[in-house]
């Protein structure tokens, strides 16, 4: 199943992997939104048993473990070594791969179900990601993915704009762009808005740190700054009813492999 011709190294991906590795110890407790999104994603398909499931961007293996307990054979893949260590410690899968979703070291048509929850927004090119998922999935198989679309983290982005002119939030594709990329495939997409409210800015920032979502593609870290700048950010934040809201434009997708 595993291809021998595998090589991937990039500064961006190394930095992303490091951010998630630093969060490996806190991820399981902090990833409430990721778990909620993952279970909604599962509702898009019925039970799949006695199949090879690829959990692409598995994190600490929460959903790998779910698939394995359903009787599937699971391959857990992540860019972060520390995340994979956590997954392996709980025996979440039968096999583990430290690899990049955009360069899957897997032979063609070896996977029955490709599952990727809240991971592909960290990739360089969604076209490449979906092409790789399609390549490794067998005819008759299914690809399930969730990701973030434009408008996610908008409150944090708007607050930072009032502090300085530097980008502090990664750009997300619009829903229309994601639809266009999925056009070559037999696919179904839906988007819904989810808002998470925090009692203070510190809790909000900590929630991002807790799941490793602090890497900015241009080389800075999201939301990390001096105390004075954080105070300015807090003053600029659009507080509603005493709470700090954070929006997520969630996209759920299913691709049927012909």
UniProtKB/Swiss-Prot annotation:
Q: Which InterPro entries match?
A: BioC, Malonyl-ACP_OMT, Methyltransf_11, SAM-dependent_MTases_sf
Instruction: Name the reaction it catalyses.
Output: malonyl-[ACP] + S-adenosyl-L-methionine = malonyl-[ACP] methyl ester + S-adenosyl-L-homocysteine
A GO molecular-function annotation: S-adenosylmethionine-dependent methyltransferase activity
Query: What are the record keywords, sorted?
Result: Biotin biosynthesis, Methyltransferase, S-adenosyl-L-methionine, Transferase
Question: What are the EC numbers?
Answer: 2.1.1.197
Q: In which pathway does it act?
A: Cofactor biosynthesis; biotin biosynthesis
Q: What is this protein called?
A: Malonyl-[acyl-carrier protein] O-methyltransferase
**Provenance organism:** Hamiltonella defensa subsp. Acyrthosiphon pisum (strain 5AT)
The major lineage groups are: Bacteria, Pseudomonadati, Pseudomonadota, Gammaproteobacteria, Enterobacterales
